[in-house]
Amino acid sequence: MAISATTQSALVGGSQDDIILSTSAPIPQRLEDDQVAVAVKAIALNPVDTKMLGDFHTPGAVLGCEFSGVITSAGPVATSEWGLREGDRVSGAIMGMNPLRPQIGAFAQHTVAPAHVVLKVREDWDFAQGAGMGNAWYTSGWALFHTMGLPAGPQLEPLHTLVPPPPGNAGKLPSTNKPITVLVSGGSSSTGTTAVQLLKLAGYHVIATCSARNFDLARQYGADEVFDHSSPTCAADIRERTRNALRFALDCITTPETTRLCYAALGRSGGRYVSLDPFSEAVAATRGVVRPDWVLGPELVGEDIAWPEPHGRKGNPKARVFCEAWTRTLQRLVDQGLVKTHPQLVRDTGLKGALGGLDDIRAKKVSGQKLVYLL
């Protein structure tokens, strides 16, 4: 399915530290052996997309990390190792606003993605649902089953067999017949509902925090217990409920307030705190028995990241190995109907509408839903 055009419409970095709709962005022409080219049919917005300004901003670079569409061309490795072929309906999680690959991003009519971050979309899913199987699923898996060091368990094959958690990350897990409890702060966010589902599949007991209006949402995705994050006694209530023994907390929001809540909820002997953004060092310093860390989803691609510190880093081969196993795991979960996407607010206003969607996210007008735009 050759693409004769050389330019396209895309959301790109503007010259005034802003995001603009360009109608003359170049279509990526070079396809590497392990990549696929995709005609984009739907895109999903994330809070990170609103942060690609200032030092993260590259004029002309395409924005966006989540998409779904139809493969127009596949490299030989993408076909031989991943079974991806022209005409396949797929979703992907890539790094937008990438100064090293400025022509590649999700918010465009055409994009390119490495095969190891691409999933085939189920036949009974539309493109909007497909666009929801991206960033959150990769980031939460990396955070829980690598950085936090939780064993994935046999329910999450082949990850469980291929990539065991690094030794020492979680410390010695308690030998008990009761499920280990994990706190998910921001349990009604996109990454939150994803993390809750994965933890339940892996056999954990999940406590979620969110606003009271989203309690039912968190429960629908599997949370065993839900607490109101705005309650002044939230952390104390969780600590009492867990008998002062909670050891694991995933912070899907990552503000000083949510870090403080997680730290206060963790038990007397401390434990592991993992966030999705750099956390407050001042808060982290308040409890030496808690080991904090944070994750950067694009690291899973395995390539150098040229964003400003502390986000910039060399390519991580171990992250790519994890990602390859995790993609095979996610594909099985999708195919078997074991996971569902976050609730979606679908709009058919295309890339132009997505500009307004970024403003809605900045203004916190969207809660408990993922914004998806059809192209």
From Swiss-Prot:
Catalytically driven reaction(s): (2S,4S)-4-hydroxy-4-methylglutamate + 8 malonyl-CoA + 3 S-adenosyl-L-methionine + ATP + 8 NADPH + 11 H(+) = (2S)-3-[(2S)-3,5-dioxo-4-[(2E,4R,6R,8E,10E,12E)-4,6,12-trimethyltetradeca-2,8,10,12-tetraenoyl]pyrrolidin-2-yl]-2-hydroxy-2-methylpropanoate + AMP + 3 S-adenosyl-L-homocysteine + 8 CO2 + diphosphate + 8 NADP(+) + 8 CoA + 6 H2O
- Annotated GO MF terms: nucleotide binding; oxidoreductase activity, acting on NAD(P)H
| InterPro entries, per the entry | ADH-like_C (IPR013149), ADH-like_N (IPR013154), GroES-like_sf (IPR011032), NAD(P)-bd_dom_sf (IPR036291), PKS_ER (IPR020843), Trans-enoyl_RdTase-like (IPR047122)
The protein's annotated pathway:
Secondary metabolite biosynthesis
Q: Where does substrate bind?
A: 135-142, 297-301
Q: What is its EC number?
A: 1.-.-.-
Q: Which EC class does it fall in?
A: oxidoreductase
Q: Which SUPFAM superfamilies match?
A: GroES-like (SSF50129), NAD(P)-binding Rossmann-fold domains (SSF51735)
Q: Which UniProt keywords apply?
A: NADP, Nucleotide-binding, Oxidoreductase
Chain residues that bind NADP(+): 48-51, 188-191, 211-214, 276-277, 366-367
Organism's domain of life? Eukaryota
Coiled-coil positions are: none
List, alphabetically, the Pfam families matched.
ADH_N, ADH_zinc_N
* Family stated for the protein in its record: Belongs to the zinc-containing alcohol dehydrogenase family.
Give the protein's biological function: Trans-enoyl reductase; part of the gene cluster that mediates the biosynthesis of the tetramic acid Sch210972, a potential anti-HIV fungal natural product that contains a decalin core. The PKS module of cghG together with the enoylreductase cghC catalyze the formation of the polyketide unit which is then conjugated to 4-hydroxyl-4-methyl glutamate (HMG) by the condensation domain of the cghG NRPS module.
Task: Share what the entry says about its subunit structure, partners included.
Answer: Monomer.
Q: What is this protein called?
A: Trans-enoyl reductase cghC
Species in which this protein is naturally found: Chaetomium globosum (strain ATCC 6205 / CBS 148.51 / DSM 1962 / NBRC 6347 / NRRL 1970)
